[in-house]
């Protein structure tokens, strides 16, 4: 088995230090406009690793890909359709399968490391 523990601090440190570009308003926002910034760290076809940051507010999602996230800073409540809410914050990970539907209520500007696959 490969030891990957050394990669986690590297990825988190790189993600926190990444210069983010303006990615415009969040299309999934369901209230006031929410601003997003981000940086793609690696991409190959439909697979992508990057950093995403978004200002507070409510949004609704229908995911077209699988997504794994590691929260670097900020807080949000994730509520799948028909399921209970889950609060996530710094150091938490979450996996959203393709087709996942639900809401994200971002309470504090969130920065996440994401993997699309």
Ranges and model annotations:
Residues 61, 78, 112-114:
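Short hydrophobic/aromatic-rich beta-strand segments that constitute the beta-sheet cores
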Residues 98-117:
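Ligand-binding loop in jelly-roll beta-barrel domains
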Residues 82-98:
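Short acidic-glycine-tyrosine-enriched beta hairpin
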Residues 43-63, 97-98:
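Conserved short histidine dyad/triad with adjacent acidic residue
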Residues 1-46:
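A short, N-terminal "cap"/entry segment at the start of jelly-roll beta-barrel domains
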Residues 54, 63-78:
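Short, conserved beta-strand element in jelly-roll/cupin
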Residues 49-51, 68, 93:
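Conserved hydrophobic/aromatic beta-strand scaffold that supports enzyme active sites
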């Amino acid at each position: 088995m490969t030891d990957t523990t050394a990669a986690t601090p590297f990825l988190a440190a790189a993600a926190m230090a990444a210069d983010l570009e303006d990615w415009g308003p969040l299309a999934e926002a369901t209230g006031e406009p929410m601003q997003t910034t981000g940086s793609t760290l690696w991409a190959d076809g439909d697979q992508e690793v990057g950093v995403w940051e978004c200002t507070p507010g409510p949004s609704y999602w229908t995911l077209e890909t699988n997504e794994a996230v590691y929260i670097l800073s900020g807080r949000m409540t994730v509520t799948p359709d028909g399921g209970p809410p889950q609060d996530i914050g710094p150091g938490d990970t979450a996996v959203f399968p393709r087709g996942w539907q639900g809401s994200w209520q971002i309470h504090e500007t969130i920065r996440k490391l994401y993997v699309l696959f």
